[in-house]
Amino acid sequence: MTKISQIVLVAGAALSVAAPALAQNPDQSRAYSAELAADAQTRSSLLAPAASGSNGFTISDQSGNYKLTIGGTVQFRYTLDTRSDGVQGTGPGATNINKDDSLSTGFSNSITRIHFGGNIINPDMTFKVSALINGSTQNVTNAAGAAIGTTNNGFVLEDAYGQYKFDNGFSVKWGQFKLPTIREEIVGDEYSLAAGTSTINTLFSPGRTQGIELGYTAESFRAMFDFSDGMRSANTDYTNGAEADYAMSARGEFKIAGDWSRFNDFTSFRNQDFAALVGAGIHWEQGGNTNDGFNGTNATFGNETFLYSIDGALEGSGWNAFAAFTGSNADGDQRNSISTYSLLLQGGVFVTENCELFARYEGIFADSEVTGVGAGNELDPSDFHFVTIGSNYYILPDSHAAKITADAVISVNENAGLQNLVQSTSANNKFGAGVPNTNNGVLGDGDSGEIAFRLQFQLLF
């Protein structure tokens, strides 16, 4: 067979196969096109980015009953902290910071986080797992030359919970999650107005716990009630002495205007209407009477802790305002009852479509006997004041997905005493010390005028 004959034979075979398709009527052609489009839509949804660009990538079946979302946070920061030379010593008036450490500068990955979420069986059965990739070091030493803080590297489990929403507005959550007492902690660092959460949040935040939460959401009201292992008890076993014997938390919120999603952050973009929210949260726990022997250091003394917070938010077209009053009382078998209070005021306004200016005030009013009783033990000063001013530049308008933040945290008075503000003379304290704090850049100063400059780039994916 010649080459020309072969070509003719192949062409004829191709025409015979294509002839039925060419002979299709218009209805058959439209049906076939619709089938192809449906198949393409199903395949493209397997790895589709969320519309906002900051809610992760989603893998889903066609029904939507099984869905997996993968996302994360990367915050890269440059910090410059300037302060007076440290005051040697370990008492309430000392900084516990090396005398030569009047200037600290450098880069850090302030937050690197990855999270998985979605639903199984149906959209009402949801789950979330998140982990923090931790690799930070606090290069601060006390008078004896010992390092303050520890170096941790690796994955740290944060959230690990399941949740089911009922048709009547109720929901139940179980696992490891944030306690709902303080709104700033609920919102988190990624959606904070400044480069990070406040010193107040560092002191009072109940953090994550393991437990059960019952929730209810209506048109203008929602509430949460938790029974848990207590504040800051994430990643502990039931035999751990650091856990509370029992703990209960509750939070209620009234939405005056706007949608609930408006209060997932503190910012209000120019294309958003007026919104207002009033909320209050409480937490109470009793500990130290069980698990003693498994962790003798943490379960040596009985203790009772009460935490409460009242907050309000106003948001408009391109502006926002927020206020919160937070207080606590810590009482124990072998320590005094200590009460501490705080006030946070903050607000922001957009000056362009992408640029937002903001300011924040923090006042912390501590019990003067927080470090003990008697002459020389009183905390002086017992009030601490901070002012933060800065700007956010949203690379993608109306989205936190790519954001540059520049701010300065100014200590109005000396703040070295914040390192003693642990509200306890025993190891079972549940509150954090205010300094040194690499999140807000404040390392502690025996004089007024410490300033921490922060320049941060954020990516959410």
Question: What do these predicted regions represent?
Answer:
Residues 1-14, 228, 245, 306-307, ...:
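Domain-scale selection of a single, long terminal region
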Residues 52, 56-233, 241-260, 264-277, ...:
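Outer membrane beta-barrel
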Residues 2-75, 81-89, 260-263, 456, ...:
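N-terminal periplasmic/intermembrane-space "pro-region" immediately following the signal or transit peptide
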Residues 19, 68, 170, 400-402:
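Residue-level signal for beta-strand positions within conserved beta-sheet cores that form or flank
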Residues 25-32, 37, 42, 47, ...:
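Outer-membrane beta-barrel pore domains
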